């Protein structure tokens, strides 16, 4: 297991799959399935996170009936209309202990890791922490 001095860069997933606010919900669903992920950062044209779209966001919106899902796809619903905002971010050099506390305090399953220019460079998920602990 990593020591208490380990930082976000030691555990995060690099080169995250990202979408833009104008991405269709259908495309976001396809990316989630294709890359076997449960959520991804939503970024602006400069790569700065503006939100997060997750399976939870999609399911909460689509739960009432299958007809809602069909209408949403037909209507061209966009990620920007469903994403969770703001994106909860963490600088790449943040100690893992601080990142874990931030995740708990914000009650989120993932943090968007940012560089010194505020651009998304990775994702740190609750699953990453579970894997770290399980691998001991």
Residue ranges and their predicted role:
Residues 1-15, 54-89, 95-108, 120, ...:
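Tandem CBS (Bateman) regulatory domains
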Residues 19-36, 43, 89-107, 114-115, ...:
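The conserved cystathionine-beta-synthase
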Residues 32-35, 40-56, 103, 111-127:
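A glycine-centered beta-loop-beta connector
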